[in-house]
């Protein structure tokens, strides 16, 4: 099957915070050096942020370095953390407040912000496009491309127009090859292509096993008078 191809200097797989920040920083460096650079971000979601479900307590040091003027650029960081209260639930009906002296520094969030990570990604995408990054939402990277020496040379996106029976429909369209001198895999936890790369290049050798957790998101409607009274347990 013949697929159309596009060539870039850097192909970034994943339009989450790490992929978008990578693309932005690369273009910033290129512009500082007056160098030509082509960067593409391919994202499986129908739009940037569509697959970002996380609410987030956001520490800003990375954003401070990437966009020092973010406070004047309408970044979606509007709700600063006012205080921390941590409770330990010892049973279904009992618990107690943990004294501050026993709370590690890393668990204090003064100066951080309560944000929607999806909205932050949308904002980062707008900054990336302003830096001339190409962003392709709605295209899932499904295959890693290798050259004759086994070196990664980009990715291919999924074919479209495949029926439930696996047969091609009239609307069939072959995926695209996005070829890059460098490919950055920023798929997040247990990304399909990332797992292939880990296995192919034996990246787990002499490494501790990874730990994974499942996050559950709840949206509560509360009395506006209580909107600041949030405790982490």
What are the residue ranges of the model-derived segments?
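Beta1/beta-strand and adjacent pyrophosphate-binding region of the FAD-binding site
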Residues: 4-18, 40
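Conserved Rossmann-like nucleotide-cofactor binding loop
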Residues: 18, 47, 190
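Active-site catalytic pocket residues across diverse enzymes, especially alpha/beta-hydrolases
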Residues: 26-30, 197, 201
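Glycine-rich FAD pyrophosphate-binding loop
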Residues: 27-51
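N-terminal FAD cofactor-binding segment of flavoenzymes
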Residues: 44-92
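Feature captures the FAD/FMN-dependent oxidoreductase FAD-binding
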Residues: 77-79, 87-194
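Central beta-strand plus flanking loop segment that forms part of the substrate or channel wall
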Residues: 202-230
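Conserved small/polar residues in nucleotide/adenosyl-binding loops
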Residues: 233
């Amino acid at each position: 099957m013949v697929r159309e191809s596009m060539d870039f200097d850097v192909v970034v797989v994943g339009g989450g915070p790490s992929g978008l920040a990578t693309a932005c920083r690369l273009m910033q460096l290129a512009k500082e050096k007056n160098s030509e650079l082509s960067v593409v971000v391919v994202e499986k979601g129908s739009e940037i942020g569509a697959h970002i479900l996380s609410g987030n307590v956001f520490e800003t040091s990375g954003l401070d370095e990437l966009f020092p003027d973010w406070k004047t650029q309408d970044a979606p960081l509007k709700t600063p953390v006012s205080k921390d209260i941590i409770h330990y639930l010892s049973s279904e009906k009992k618990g107690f407040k943990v004294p501050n002296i026993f709370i590690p520094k890393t668990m204090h969030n003064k100066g951080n912000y309560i944000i929607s990570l999806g909205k932050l990604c949308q904002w980062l995408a707008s900054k990336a496009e302003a830096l001339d990054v190409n962003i392709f939402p709605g295209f899932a990277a499904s295959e890693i491309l290798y050259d004759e020496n086994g070196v990664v040379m980009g990715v291919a996106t999924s074919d479209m127009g495949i029926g439930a029976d696996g047969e091609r429909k009239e609307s069939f369209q072959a995926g695209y090859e996005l070829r890059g001198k460098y490919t950055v895999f920023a798929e997040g936890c247990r990304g399909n292509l990332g797992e292939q790369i880990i296995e192919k290049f034996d990246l787990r050798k002499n490494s501790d096993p990874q730990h994974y957790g499942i996050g559950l998101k709840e949206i509560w409607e509360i009395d506006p008078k209580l909107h600041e009274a949030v405790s982490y347990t």
